[in-house]
A protein has these predicted regions:
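Coil residues (strongly favoring Ser/Thr
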Residues: 35-36, 42-43, 51, 108, ...
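A short, solvent-exposed loop/turn motif at the edges and junctions
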Residues: 82-84, 108-121
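Exposed, low-structure sequence patches enriched in small/polar residues
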Residues: 285, 418-870
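Conserved "repeat-terminator" motif of extracellular CCP/Sushi domains
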Residues: 53-57, 132-142, 146-151
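Short Pro-Gly-centered beta-turn/loop motif in secreted/extracellular proteins
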Residues: 72-75, 98-106
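Short, ordered, surface-exposed loop/turn motifs in non-cytosolic proteins
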Residues: 58-63, 69-84
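Structured extracytoplasmic
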Residues: 140, 149-312, 318-326, 389-491, ...
Length: 870
């Protein structure tokens, strides 16, 4: 009566990468729990082996494990049964189950779990006595609301207790703690089918990639392309404040960059669900355990379970209102002390986050002692997509963390922090990247899957292919504008051609060195030629890194070129392919020619303090309409040019500022604390060809303040003074904007060289609201626009002596420098950002002064810009 016993081996393993891929291809439930019928044989390939020689069992057995599709974690206490039968069971806390029956009741196996969609698997009656992995998908739907007429909802009462006890349960509030941290970061290309791949030109050399495509079905595939691991010791003290992390081992394939290893550290990637706000890709989301959680979330108690003999309460949560930065998901709370046992966070479809289709966070805690639970496992996965590129291949990033050797309130922790008090908080030990295979086998917290093991060999093989390097260069040219050979870098291409009224057509060739030529020395230079003035311009510079951490360097340069007076990287410039296209019409271009010699020394300390000294000699010759006669002829000048040698120092304090390191240069990622800068400079008349004696100083404080859930505030306040009687190039020439490209640090409705001062003060203020009012307009909110407003103000004045020098009555030049002595400069702006996820549109009003002397006076302007932000 019974069929021969069949043994079933799973050949298509559902590993962690496969489960992350499934996240990218799943859809949200639109408010309803949906049944999904999948053909089991399509999802898990089974290889059946004949075992007729074995004794026939009395009962047939189906064994398996139920996994969460998004986070690759077992689903505890799921219900597995055959509909319209009495055959069923409940999985244990590890998702494992066994079903025993004499015959297969029907061909449908149903799996249900609270917080998940119901899944029906078409089960082959021949596939029995087997072990299989079942993958189910989370539902963005809570149980139906139960109306409690008398008193508060039990869910609300329970969560109030959780909020009340969270400070005691949060280990990070203890005096000190320490642990060993293992981090793993993986990147995969997803949605790349064989058919799509074959359509890409010149892919024949990559044919072996087909063997590295993992899939759960013929339609779902992804290609692992990058893997990095890091092992570190982390120490933290709250009283006194201090922290220290030592990355003792790192292993990576793909991008060779030390700062990537740093960003895997605990200080860069630490998510604490007990906090009121959780930072996800620089966006503040309200935690479901926030003290104000009842204002933003709906909670429902859905189940009681036992984990390691301890009763835990499952609570589902979701946002009260769509469009707010909140999560949906579930948390499991220990019944005895209201601490977290595990939590699953998902970002809803309506969340205003760019370039990301889905984000999932999973944390699991384990008992530290009889009363305290500490974080044991932490997973973050995100599916990145191009704007409006749902049909294009995407990208999955997945970070997995685990914690061992946990210590709380022990004396050695503070000693470890104090022992290295003069060093930086995050460091990488020498030889961290040189650990061998045996070290990782012994110290890795969890073994790599077979797929992850293949990544190291796979990436090494790909990078040796000439076609791969060609693709890399093409992508670099398109995105960065530069082209690299082994020893030299050429570009950027957008500076190769431009036009202006002085030079006519300007052609420029730029070249720099790469780390393959000099490890710590960067040489850069360019040559340019103007067809109208028929003059060559050029620049040569050298940067030598004395130390990378803490950073110190010397820099020297010589430039023989037009002086465009650009003050920061956001300034638009005419030395640009599209510079004339975005210039304001009717505004004369104001240029000067300069010969500039520069020598700099920079030294940074681990505590965030740095000093930057420089000596700059410049010969400055302005072009009309900027004046020179009767201004520069003071102190034996020839009246047409200004010669000056300035000594300067900049003191800067940026506590816990983060950087993204390049081969030689670096980009600041900002700080959570205010950044303070003090600049002091001066010159001595007659010394090193200086024509004037003066001193000047400027002080500024800037900060980005997150005021979630009300958005983000940026402010900058500044003041300065110039002592001495000097011509306008040595005064404070307030930064105006002659382009329709918006600049956050300039006064966009002010013209360049419109106002000068020898004493001044001002501020810049911008409030980004997020969705703002757009969240309440039914059709508009689907576009996920973001709202902001800003205010800029400046007061400045000139001494009588400086005013008379720079506006001489005997001058034949009609150009007049203005001051802000009688009325401050004020501009007010608002606008829309996140247009098509990358563009920003500013509407700016100049409130005062309104008496504009340019040929086309404007009190209102429209500006565009590009802004890449999650």
């Amino acid at each position: 009566m019974m069929a021969d016993k069949m043994s079933i081996n799973v050949t298509s393993k559902i590993n962690s990468i496969t489960l992350v891929l499934a996240m990218a291809l799943s859809a949200f439930a639109n408010g309803q729990v949906r049944d999904s019928t999948l053909h089991f044989v399509d999802s898990i390939q089974l290889q059946i082996k004949d075992s007729s020689q074995l004794p026939k069992p009395k009962l047939k057995t189906l064994k398996g494990v139920v996994f969460d599709k998004t986070i690759n974690e077992p689903v505890a206490f799921a219900t597995i049964y055959f509909p319209k039968s009495t055959v069923g069971t409940v999985a244990d806390e590890q998702g494992y189950f066994e079903l025993n029956f004499e015959k297969v009741p029907n061909d449908t196996l149903r799996i249900q779990a609270i917080g998940y969609k119901t899944f029906n698997y078409i089960w082959s009656k021949k596939s029995i006595d087997s072990f299989a992995l079942f993958v189910i998908e989370q539902s963005n739907t809570m149980l139906k609301e139960v109306v409690v007429k008398a008193g508060e909802s039990p869910s609300i009462l329970f969560m109030k207790e959780v909020f009340k006890h969270k400070n005691g349960n949060d280990i990070s509030t203890n005096s000190n703690y320490a642990y060993e941290l293992y981090n793993k970061l993986e990147a995969d290309v997803t949605g790349l089918t064989k058919e799509q791949f074959e359509k890409i030109p010149f892919t024949k050399p990559f044919s072996f990639i087909y063997n590295n495509l993992d899939s759960t079905s013929e339609k779902e595939s992804f290609l692992p392309v990058y893997l990095i691991e890091a092992l570190s010791d982390y120490y933290c003290s709250n009283n006194p404040k201090g922290q220290r992390e030592i990355i003792k081992a790192s292993l990576q394939r793909g991008i060779e960059n030390e700062s990537i290893a740093q960003f895997l550290g605990s200080m860069y990637q630490n998510i604490n669900c007990y906090n009121n706000f959780i930072d996800v890709f620089n966006k503040k989301f309200i935690s479901p355990l926030s003290s104000a959680g009842l204002l933003f979330y709906k909670y429902r108690i859905t189940d009681t379970q036992y984990v390691k003999g301890v009763p835990v309460i499952q609570v589902q949560f979701k946002p009260k209102r769509k469009g707010e930065n909140c999560f949906f998901g579930s948390c499991w709370i220990v019944d005895s002390n209201y601490s977290l046992q595990r939590i699953q966070l998902n970002i809803p479809e309506e969340a205003n986050v760019n370039f990301i289709d889905k984000i999932s966070i999973y944390q699991e805690y384990k008992p530290l002692d009889s009363t305290r639970w500490f974080l044991n496992k932490d997973k973050l996965s995100a599916h990145f997509i191009l704007p409006y590129g749902s049909k294009l291949p995407g990208f999955i990033g997945r970070k997995t963390s685990s914690y061992k050797n946990i210590h709380v309130n022990e004396a050695f922790i503070l000693d470890s922090i104090n022992r290295v008090a003069q060093q930086k908080e995050l460091s990488i030990v020498a030889g961290a990247k040189d650990k061998d295979k045996s070290y990782w086998l012994e110290n890795r917290h969890d073994s790599l899957s077979q797929n992850e093991k293949n990544i190291y060999k796979f990436i090494d093989t790909v990078q040796t292919l000439p076609v791969f390097n060609l693709y890399k260069r093409v992508i670099q040219v398109v995105t960065l504008g530069t082209y690299d050979t082994k020893y030299f870098q050429f570009g950027p291409y957008w500076s190769m051609y431009s036009r202006n009224r002085i030079e006519g057509t300007r052609l420029r060739f730029s070249m720099g060195t790469t780390k393959n030529l000099f490890k710590d020395l960067y040489l850069f230079g360019y040559a340019a030629y103007g067809t109208l003035d028929q003059k060559w311009k050029y620049k040569g510079s050298a940067l030598y890194l004395l130390n990378r951490a803490p950073r110190s360097y010397v820099y020297a340069s010589y430039k023989h070129d037009l002086d465009r007076q650009t003050g920061n990287y956001e300034d638009a410039t005419s030395d640009y392919l599209f510079g004339n296209v975005i210039r304001k019409s009717g505004v004369p271009i104001k240029l000067a020619f300069s010969d500039e010699y520069r020598l700099e020394f920079f030294k940074e300390h681990f505590n965030g303090f740095s000093f930057h000294t420089q000596i700059v000699h410049k010969d400055f010759t302005p072009y009309s309409p900027l004046p020179s006669n009767f201004i520069f002829e003071q102190n034996n000048n020839n009246g047409m040019s200004l010669s000056n040698t300035e000594f300067g120092i900049k003191l800067r304090y940026a506590y816990k500022e983060k950087f993204l390191e390049g081969d030689y240069l670096r980009a600041s990622l900002g700080s959570k604390y205010p950044i303070i800068e003090l600049k002091i400079a001066g010159a001595i008349g007659g010394f090193l060809k200086s024509s004037y004696t003066y001193q000047k100083a400027q002080l500024s404080v800037s900060d980005n303040v997150n005021i979630a859930p009300f958005g983000n505030l940026y402010y900058k306040v500044f003041t300065g003074k110039v002592l001495g009687v000097v011509p306008y190039p040595l005064l404070e020439v307030h930064p105006g904007n002659d382009f329709h490209y918006y600049n956050r640090n300039d006064f966009n409705m002010m013209y360049r060289y419109e106002f000068v001062s020898d004493r001044y003060a001002g501020f810049i203020f911008e409030h980004t609201l997020g969705n703002g009012v757009f969240n309440y307009i039914p059709v508009i909110k689907k576009f996920k626009f973001r709202q902001f407003w800003n205010l800029k103000a400046l007061y400045g004045n000139l001494s009588k002596e400086n005013y008379n020098l720079n506006n001489p009555s005997s001058s034949s030049n009609n150009y007049t420098f203005r001051t802000l002595a009688n009325i401050p400069y004020i501009e007010l702006g608002t606008g829309i950002e996140n247009i098509l996820q990358v563009f920003r549109l500013d509407f700016v009003w100049r409130l005062s002064p309104t008496n504009i002397v340019e040929s086309i006076p404007r009190n209102f302007g429209v500006f565009g810009s590009v802004k890449f932000e999650f």
